[in-house]
Every structure is written in structure tokens, then in C-alpha cells.
Amino acid sequence: MKQSTLLTVTSLLSILLLSLHLTSDFIHNAGELSLRGLFISVLILVVLLYGTLVLAERRSGHVIMLLGALAALGMPVIHLMTARGVAGAIDRPYAFIFVWALLCLGVTGLFSFFLSVQGLLGLKRGQQG
């Protein structure tokens, strides 16, 4: 499979997992749900989606996918660094899905990060040659 196709697929998977994770956060922390937070979340996801699907072969698309990869990779880290951490969700009915989603976000985020960096380096070499 081509590297650009792999990057697109893993970026789309990361976007899907991020949207599911944000939904879970909004549901389980209903006090944090606001129109502003929802608008910002939608805006970020749309930018990630646009960069992945429309700008995939451009440097700007690779940069957007790189930022999305960092967001996906950072989600497990952020949750582990909070006071409650993942342990705060372990006794809840949704614990398995929550931890599984964090694990998948970390995996797809790291893989997308590597592919984005390789893609950016490939674009740079292609423009010099």
C-alpha cells in the first residue's frame, strides 16, 4: 500500500477515534459541555478532515495531519497526567471502551506521526530535485 494512502487511512481513523473520545468526554463530564466547546471541537475536526482529504498531497495537508497525529498521540498522555488519570474511569461501565480508545488513539497517532514526517521529508526532497 502506498504511504500516502496509509497516512490518509490512519489520519481518518485518528479523526474518528478523536471524535468518539470527545463525545465520551462530553457525555461523562456534562458540566464541561458548552456551545463554545462543541463549536471548537467541530472546527478542529473539520480542519483535520480537510487537511486529510483535500490537502493530502500538499505540505499544508501533511502539517495538518502531523498536528492531528500529535493530538491523537497526546490524548492518552493528557488523561494519564490528570489527577484522576485513567484510574478514575476504571470502575465505570464504559471503562473498557475508554481505555481501548486511548490505546488506539496512541497507536494511530504515533503511526500517523511517522508517516507525516516521512511524507514531509519526501515532499522536501521532491521539490529540491
Q: Residue spans of the language-model regions?
A:
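Short juxtamembrane and helix-loop transition motifs at transmembrane-helix boundaries
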Residues: 1-6, 22-34
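Membrane-water interface at the C-terminal end of transmembrane alpha helices
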Residues: 3-9, 52-53, 102-129
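Alpha-helical transmembrane segments
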Residues: 6-19
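C-terminal TM-helix exit segments that contain a strictly Trp-centered aromatic cap at the helix terminus
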Residues: 17-28, 70-85
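Interfacial non-cytosolic loop connecting adjacent transmembrane helices
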Residues: 29-33, 78-101
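Loop-to-helix transition at the N-terminal end of transmembrane alpha-helices
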Residues: 30-44
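Hydrophobic, membrane-inserted alpha-helices
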Residues: 44-51
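Loop-to-transmembrane helix junctions at the membrane interface
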Residues: 52-77
